[in-house]
Amino acid sequence: MRRPKKYEAGEATQYISRRAALRKLQLSLNDFRRLCILKGVYPREPKHRRRAQKGSSDIKILYHAKDIRFLLHEPIVWTLRDYKIFAKKSGRDRAIKDFRNLKRRLAMFPEIKLDHIVKERYPTFIDALKDLDDCLTLLFLFSTFPSLHLIPREQSNLCRRLTIEFLHYVIASKSLRKVFISIKGYYFQAEIKGQKVTWIVPHYYPFKPQSRQEVDFKVMSIFVEFYTIMLGFTNFRLYHGLNLAYPPQFPSNMLQDNADTLKDESSFVSDRITALNFELLRTDKVQEDEEEPDIDMELLEQDGDSKRIIKMKQEAQEVSRLRTLFKGLKFFINREVPREPLVIIIRSFGGKVSWDSSVFSGATYDESDETITHQIVDRPSLSTQYISRDYIQPQWIFDCVNQRQLLPTNKYFLGEPLPPHLSPFVDAKRDTYIPPEEKALHDPSLIETHAQSEDESEDDAAAEEEDTVEQELLDAQLQRAYQQETAEYKKYGGADGVNEDEEDSDEEDFDGEEQESDDDDEEELDEKEKRLLEEKQKMSVQSGKVHKVNKRQVHKAEVDEHRLQARMVKPRHRNLFRKLIREKQAKEKEEWLLRKKRRTIETDAKEAKKLAKREARKAAAAAAAAAAQLGAK
């Protein structure tokens, strides 16, 4: 039996460098990157890098050898090789000015088909839904881009159409569950086939070209090329599940490029929002709201876990109420408010929405409609207002959805300071720091106690100030009375005309008599009473001692326990253990910073309230003094 040589087996044969992979596949670096993105192959980190690199200490990009062998059988590799042949032949025809042959070659341009790759990477429909988050986020981003050097106009148009089709499905199925506004954009979460899909719609800003190439649009464009095929398959399956015609039929003037949309970016976005306010065509000719089936408790309680079943039923009832949260309400959006996220939310929960038809197309009713219940405004005041509707700020829509109920509108009126906008994506079990407003969503009594403590602290501060003022007045009055008494003593020899020496002698005689009477009483005590007193003293309860916790010893014990825990970790798990410790320390630091920020904000707010109250009291005192002076005159 031949003895195996070094690096002929084991980890050295499991990995292959990128240069060796390029040599094996006979592809350029750009084509190899494109192939890896489309097939989902990515670099790997070996456990022992020196063994994987066959003794080399240089840091190389390594792939699994089985992944590279997997790429050898991919039909796209031949298409990528055909690109080289096409480029050479078309360049030759262009050089010799053989335009007839060049036109024939352009008509035979090799196209990459990605259908089989989508089916290969996602064997089931649920697998595709699980990987839909990044797909939607990237396509929504590219749908806002204009035509760039590496991003053709056709690609951004395709992204725009596919994202609108997906939003129409979310609106028709009423599967939206959570929304949130952040600096990055608008977060949306929908529940589709039991899977939670979360994506970001970016804020709309005019595109500003970058002077430096900090973002690799070419690589991102390859991802978009794959995700468009994937989302097309997904939309087709989702639409047919709701008996909706696919592709959806929009009016002829929507989602089509003309001279205006290519030049004006605002009209480019306006057409997209107009399509969202348009009803889709169904294949079954039935326009009825789909209701979720009721849960039969009698059948489910046979499992024995009744608490879990009751919780499931409560969750289902909340979701059914959430699906019709804005049913029967009509909204009107002012021109300064971003329309796209509000149209998605309002229509997803059964409401009707419109805007100014003179500025944007697609409006269904005017501002003068008396049946409008809410008008969404983002300005401090309005010149004309209707009594029959509520004028609210946009945050009211998002907070109502997250709390799954219609909130009072008095905190969201024009010019009112808005309450904190809380994230619905907080996990109470994993996140250590939870603000008091977030806790109040689950337990409303906590916010009441928090408000009461703030009011009590303010009342205590005000009471202390009032006590100090009253104490100063009493001290002044007592000082004045003492001065008057001393003046009378000096003038008349005492308050009642009696000398002080006579009073002192009388007091001494009275004290002597009291001492004699006390001695007689002590002698009259019987022995029985003395015994009772002694027994009572023996029966007295001794005061306990407070056990003080030594924080230094507790901290030392925790550190020793942590060191012992670190020693017990196996060597192969030490990196994972250190990673967990770093994550724990980062969370603790983040929690500490959030609590510190919260304390500073609360102290600043309290100081501002105290200062305002002091100023109000000073103003009231000055007004009272001025009124008293006028009355005296």
UniProtKB/Swiss-Prot annotation:
It is found in: Nucleus, Nucleolus; Nucleus, Nucleoplasm. The modification Phosphoserine is found at residues 453, 457. Residues 454-470, 498-526 have a biased composition (Acidic residues). This is Pescadillo homolog. InterPro entries: BRCT_dom (IPR001357), BRCT_dom_sf (IPR036420), PES (IPR010613). GO terms for molecular function: ribonucleoprotein complex binding; RNA binding. Residues 450-470, 490-567 are annotated as: Disordered. Residues 527-538, 555-564 have a biased composition (Basic and acidic residues). Residues 321-414 form the BRCT domain. It holds the Pfam family Pescadillo_N. Residues 545-554 have a biased composition (Basic residues).
